[in-house]
C-alpha cells in the first residue's frame, strides 16, 4: 500500500472490508460481527474503516448502490433511449442482474438486511415531491413489485 495514492488506498480498504464482511457473514450472524473482528479479518485499521463507512450496514449499502449503478450504466450503454422493446429489455436485464449477484443479495437476505436491496431499488425510481402524485405512486408500486419478485425468487 506504500506506493498507492489516497484513492487507491481507499479502494483497497473498501474492497478488503467488503470481502471480509461477506466472508464473516458466512460463518457468523451479522449482528455478532464486531468492527474489530471485521478490520482484523480485512487486515486494515479501525480508522480506515470509519474513514470509508459509518457502519457495517453502510458497507453493504454502498456495495448495493455500486452494483446497481454499474448495472444501470451498462444497460444504458448497451440500450440507448429509443431501443425497440427497451422496457422489456430493462426488466429482463434487471432480473438477470439480481441473478448474477445472487450471492451478495442472498447474504443480505440471510442477515435480515433485505431492506438494503429495497432501499437501493427504490432509489432508482423518482418518487420526489416534484413529480405528480400518480407517477410517484406508480414508481413506488413498480419498485416494491420488483423487490417482491426478487425477494421471492431468491
Regions found by a protein language model. Give the residues of each.
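Hydrophobic alpha-helical connector segments
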Residues: 76-103
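Short functional hotspots where side chains directly engage DNA or cofactors
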Residues: 46
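Amphipathic alpha-helical packing segments from all-alpha helical-bundle domains
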Residues: 89, 93, 109-144
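An amphipathic alpha-helical interaction segment
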Residues: 100, 137-152
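Cytosolic nucleotide-binding catalytic cores of signal-transduction proteins
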Residues: 25-28, 127, 134, 149
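N-terminal intrinsically disordered/low-complexity leader segments
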Residues: 1-10
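An amphipathic alpha-helix adjacent to DNA-recognition modules
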Residues: 11-22, 26, 31-35, 40-43, ...
